[in-house]
Amino acid sequence: MTFKSRDLSRRALLVAAIVLPTACSHTPPPAAATALPPIVFVHGNGDTAALWVSTIWRFESNRWPRNRLHAIDLPYPLARDDDAVEQPGRTSTTEHMQFLAAEVEKVLRNTGATQVVLVGNSRGGNAIRNYVANGSGAAKVSHAVLGGTPNHGVWADANVLPRN
């Protein structure tokens, strides 16, 4: 082997040592994080957004960006005894849906996404179903996951409630 060919081999080896690890590494492009849809978690009757902490941790541990995970807190999470009659500290089905719609709009605006995934528990699932079926949600929701959602709503029966 001549001096020139040995020098060329060293250069080729050096270049390969620098270029190959970079060329072979798999780094997702920055746009990959925005390709994941934002998820909005909706709690149930009488709950809070804290219900979703461990679920959000699970998504984060699977590399879902934290800025695409949103647990919302409903201002008055309890359902009214009678949906048509105002009751202090409680919301109607319509008010619940309107609050969810406003939160979805905020998430869409803040993330630049065109659709969200909604995940609901109990009464939160009712709000999601109502938003998709009767609100403006059909075009803004790509997927809905409803867990423990009562099919006929949340209601109270005065004959069943304990008397004080």
PLM segments and residue spans:
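Hydrophobic residues on the short alpha-helix immediately C-terminal to a glycine-rich phosphate/catalytic loop
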Residues: 17, 55, 130-132
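Short, surface-exposed "cap/lid" segments of acyl-processing enzymes
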Residues: 33-71
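Short, flexible hinge/linker loops that cap or flank conserved catalytic cores
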Residues: 7, 31-34, 110
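Bacterial Sec signal peptide processing site at the extreme N-terminus
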Residues: 24-36
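Serine-dependent carboxylesterase/thioesterase catalytic core
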Residues: 40-43, 72, 76-90, 94-164
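N-terminal secretory signal peptides
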Residues: 1-8, 12-23
